[in-house]
Amino acid sequence: MAEAGLRGWLLWALLLRLAQSEPYTTIHQPGYCAFYDECGKNPELSGSLMTLSNVSCLSNTPARKITGDHLILLQKICPRLYTGPNTQACCSAKQLVSLEASLSITKALLTRCPACSDNFVNLHCHNTCSPNQSLFINVTRVAQLGAGQLPAVVAYEAFYQHSFAEQSYDSCSRVRVPAAATLAVGTMCGVYGSALCNAQRWLNFQGDTGNGLAPLDITFHLLEPGQAVGSGIQPLNEGVARCNESQGDDVATCSCQDCAASCPAIARPQALDSTFYLGQMPGSLVLIIILCSVFAVVTILLVGFRVAPARDKSKMVDPKKGTSLSDKLSFSTHTLLGQFFQGWGTWVASWPLTILVLSVIPVVALAAGLVFTELTTDPVELWSAPNSQARSEKAFHDQHFGPFFRTNQVILTAPNRSSYRYDSLLLGPKNFSGILDLDLLLELLELQERLRHLQVWSPEAQRNISLQDICYAPLNPDNTSLYDCCINSLLQYFQNNRTLLLLTANQTLMGQTSQVDWKDHFLYCANAPLTFKDGTALALSCMADYGAPVFPFLAIGGYKGKDYSEAEALIMTFSLNNYPAGDPRLAQAKLWEEAFLEEMRAFQRRMAGMFQVTFMAERSLEDEINRTTAEDLPIFATSYIVIFLYISLALGSYSSWSRVMVDSKATLGLGGVAVVLGAVMAAMGFFSYLGIRSSLVILQVVPFLVLSVGADNIFIFVLEYQRLPRRPGEPREVHIGRALGRVAPSMLLCSLSEAICFFLGALTPMPAVRTFALTSGLAVILDFLLQMSAFVALLSLDSKRQEASRLDVCCCVKPQELPPPGQGEGLLLGFFQKAYAPFLLHWITRGVVLLLFLALFGVSLYSMCHISVGLDQELALPKDSYLLDYFLFLNRYFEVGAPVYFVTTLGYNFSSEAGMNAICSSAGCNNFSFTQKIQYATEFPEQSYLAIPASSWVDDFIDWLTPSSCCRLYISGPNKDKFCPSTVNSLNCLKNCMSITMGSVRPSVEQFHKYLPWFLNDRPNIKCPKGGLAAYSTSVNLTSDGQVLDTVAILSPRLEYSGTISAHCNLYLLDSTSRFMAYHKPLKNSQDYTEALRAARELAANITADLRKVPGTDPAFEVFPYTITNVFYEQYLTILPEGLFMLSLCLVPTFAVSCLLLGLDLRSGLLNLLSIVMILVDTVGFMALWGISYNAVSLINLVSAVGMSVEFVSHITRSFAISTKPTWLERAKEATISMGSAVFAGVAMTNLPGILVLGLAKAQLIQIFFFRLNLLITLLGLLHGLVFLPVILSYVGPDVNPALALEQKRAEEAVAAVMVASCPNHPSRVSTADNIYVNHSFEGSIKGAGAISNFLPNNGRQF
């Protein structure tokens, strides 16, 4: 009802106006004209964008019959008005020529859709030439140009049937402008743009002289059927060609990209869901429940039926029974390893100074390679594999098109400014956000101009570098001025001119007069960025001062839909050319960027209360990573000091205050740290000799990691030496050797396992991680070798000092009186013996422990299935980095994602008709062509991650060739048959490149090669908006046979418009390539970037398969997507299976080494493996809960976790395996007491202090992936090593080795015989049940230790 009432009111107003107006059109009858012929220029107009056509003369006369050339011209321009030889019309031949000229601009945009172009031409042909013109045209204003001349028509009304107008508009509403990736109607609807355009607004713009293109004012009235205007007026209601219908046998229908009705049915793709289901539950959860249930049943059986206690009743193996071959092999392994390290330790301890010198020499020689160290700081070189597909694609793209330009960007908000309401004369009431305020825009303009004129001194060039030396200038790349530089901001809508920004004017619209200012112009340009002259009284252009349009998503952000006035952020972007590494211009660009950053910091401080400013330069990410690395070096140094202090204090065995300085181990601890650092420096130097580049991350992390691992071995070795009682008459060197023989096999097991894991971690293709793994692996090996040599020598010297009661550090000083050293067992050992071990191994506790760890394993498995994969670039930055705010604003306010180029390689012939049709998306092209498939993908952005279709040089080239004002030839003179630019106004340029055809325009092979270079060099302008210089000059390269080649050959400055490729150009022939640019939707995190890459590659593979079917296409031809971020996120496409493979690969040698060094004990190896797997699973599960994503950095930590887990489990497992206690429970208790305390003090407590210090690091990468993850690994390793492992060993641990038990019994009997012989009145009490200091194992004879020492049992029994 309301709509009907409104229409009635409008009709009443129209009738009233007709009654009051002067009747210039007195006759409204069929066969009569309203005007005829031309009367000159419109005297009311000035300042038009181009030379306007003449206006018609008032003439209310009958239509004329036209003949001859006039009729031919009518048939050519207005074919629908041609009715044969008796055709009548209301236009002269001059009017037809003018009509053709005025339609040429619009036809250039609409010609890709023949039905739209025909409907548009037909509409204006009827207005100008219809024989029934007076029926729907009513002249409303005329001008008298001179005495005796007919009045000139300067305004009229056109009456259309509403359906006729709607159908005409609908046929054009989807036609695209490929180069701008926008709709053509966006340039033909004024302030409303494509989003708010409709038939009425589309027609109104065409009749508005304010647009600088219309020669007179036309008021369009759209009437519904049955609505009568009176005075004989009948609305025009001609037939309209539908865009999906052909207009003849040779005329193609509009393509899907330009006509929705032409699109085939495309099913919405299903969202990718990697979750598999079993019934209604996720399959992973079902499998986890089943697995945990099986484990729970096994646990219940173990506890309920007391498997272990039942077997505990069996006593020690009867020595009289024989031993199996496997028992003998296991025993021999223990014996050989123990004897070797015992003899080695004795020898080294006997020659400490010599060994130290011999150890220092190779370390210094290898460390000298550090002088050749080259640090890599480029993030691409650090975090992407050089041989990866993405790096190869990047190299291919950069080789042929140059590196992607360097972005320097500023994002500003004004959180303290309130929004306000503005009544726009054009669009009505609009809400403007606080950032869109004039004083803020003036501040931004001042900043932009200061940055534009920024200069910086270059020592290398010995001159000042300005923006014009390095900027990206798409429309004038060869002779760039400061105002050719690509700067995108809202201020470009005013050509960065303060006067234009402050300009105001009064304007009357629909009887309402109001003042218009910058806000109206902004609204106009945001809706129609391709406008050369807005429709306001300001009459300003929307084009940037460098000549290109500025789309709203490049200038503002934070708006919803098309409500541009509600934007919450202003965006300013300076685009610089990028250059290959080593190019001096790259250093100049970085110098300018450094000055840019300084200027922005000053602006940020100055405008703190007005703006919230975020910014970045292309160099920012690399600078910030390097900055935080340097700032975190003291944190790592503190971590080393903390570990050193702990080792120094904890290694000492203190019995009284007076002996503290003697019993302290500061020198030994410092020596141990020096051994680790020497190993690290030697490893780094070795790889520097090989030319393998290092990084600051390696300098930070490798010493810390190896120090943690090395400190474990140092602590366990010294602790074993202190706890192992010296035998009567045993020399110090033999004592040290005996201690080393007891722990060195497990030290070898840990070091070898860790080194193997690190070397296997080097299989990752990421350079930073690969070099880190190689360096760490070699450092661990060198550290073990130095511990077996240099540190043993240091321990020998320190023991000699302590035995002589000399002070630590100041070894030359000897106190006068000192009490004898105490023999206490220590608090930790007492706690483990009296409290911890009895409680842990109680039968109730053991069952609870198994169930709790089983539940932990199940929860971790489930959490592991939900871990986030990827590495957000924000995590590479310190917490105080200014880039964090920039990335936050980028994700919050940017309305479009990164550009993605679909690149074609060698082997495709673009010059053939089939080749063009398989690429383009206009009329006559394949429904599933290259660009059409990309268009289909943009319809489903949630699955394809594409938001804006690809710009297509093939489409714009075809449109450029279509007979219009674009491609013209000189018809005479010295330039005959050469290209005549559209900017040349000459009668000598009337020849079109292509002849008029009814079908789709396709050049021949010869024409293709001749005209394409002209197209690529043609600068777009209002007469020819299809010129390819700005959009495609660096995207297309051709060989003489139509295949694409390097741009240098085609766009060489020496190449003129000759129509042929000169001989010298062929010298530049390189690999063929071309590219088509689309845009991603906004990508917020690592997962979005990864999935966007996956989707783009799937789309490119699909396109490749279709294009290979085009005749003449090379089978090796390929299309691939390229985005600058691909090199960082490609690894996450396959990191899950690769990580599982790598971790599984690490477990295999770890298991093998464990079995071998544990005396070929398969069960011990399996229990080690089970514990390590549980530690890994629990670690990954807690990673998901603590927000640690899974990526290459965390993967290498998980690889090292395999090695670190060996530290927690192997010592206790070996202690259990070589124990000869009668029952599993007793052996588990003994291993927990003797070695568990050493693992806690030596492994966990040497890791934790250093790890906790890392929590203070500024770099989030260090905090998350080294502090959090290593803390998890250490705590979970500690829990599994000291809680789960003793319990599971007490149930299913390996049996006592009969050979080991037999040998121990023989040794005990021999000792007893010696004791009886030497002390017959004091019978020996030989027992091993109460020993808590050392493990039970067999040791071979030691020469020089005395006869008794050769037969003493290895349980440390004192006599």
Curated annotation (Swiss-Prot):
Major localisation: membrane
Glycosylation site list: N54, N132, N138, N244, N416, N431, N464, N479, N497, N506, N626
Pfam families registered for this protein in UniProt: NPC1_MLD (PF22314), NPC1_N (PF16414), Sterol-sensing (PF12349)
Subunit structure comment from the entry: Interacts with RAB11A, MYO5B and RAB11FIP2. Interaction with RAB11A, MYO5B and RAB11FIP2 is required for proper transport to the plasma membrane upon cholesterol depletion. Interacts with NPC2. Interacts with LIMA1.
GO CC terms in record: apical plasma membrane; cytoplasmic vesicle membrane; plasma membrane
Source organism per UniProt: Homo sapiens
Expressing tissues: Widely expressed. Expressed in liver. Also expressed in small intestine, pancreas, kidney, lung, pancreas, spleen, heart, gall bladder, brain, testis, stomach and muscle.
Chain ranges on the Extracellular side, renumbered to this chain: 22-284, 373-632, 688-696, 764-776, 868-1139, 1190-1191, 1258-1268
Cystine pairings recorded for this chain: C33-C90, C39-C57, C78-C125, C91-C129, C113-C254, C116-C172, C189-C197, C243-C259, C256-C263, C471-C485, C525-C542, C920-C925, C966-C1024, C980-C989
Family: Belongs to the patched family.
Signal sequence residues: 1-21
Catalysed reactions, semicolon-separated: cholesterol(in) = cholesterol(out); sitosterol(out) = sitosterol(in)
GO biological process terms held by the UniProt record: cellular response to sterol depletion; cholesterol biosynthetic process; cholesterol homeostasis; cholesterol transport; intestinal cholesterol absorption; lipoprotein metabolic process; sterol transport; vitamin E metabolic process
Reported function: Plays a major role in cholesterol homeostasis. Critical for the uptake of cholesterol across the plasma membrane of the intestinal enterocyte. Involved in plant sterol absorption, it transports sitosterol, although at lower rates than cholesterol. Is the direct molecular target of ezetimibe, a drug that inhibits cholesterol absorption and is approved for the treatment of hypercholesterolemia. May have a function in the transport of multiple lipids and their homeostasis, thereby influencing lipid metabolism regulation. May be involved in caveolin trafficking from the plasma membrane.
Induction: Expression is decreased in Caco-2 cells upon PPARD activation.
PTM: Highly glycosylated.
This protein's record includes keyword Glycoprotein: yes
Gene: NPC1L1
GO molecular-function term, one example from the UniProt record: myosin V binding
Alphabetical keyword list: Cell membrane, Cholesterol metabolism, Cytoplasmic vesicle, Disulfide bond, Glycoprotein, Lipid metabolism, Membrane, Signal, Steroid metabolism, Sterol metabolism, Transmembrane, Transmembrane helix, Transport
Highest rank taxon of the organism: Eukaryota
Protein name according to UniProt: NPC1-like intracellular cholesterol transporter 1
Additional information: Target of cholesterol lowering drugs.
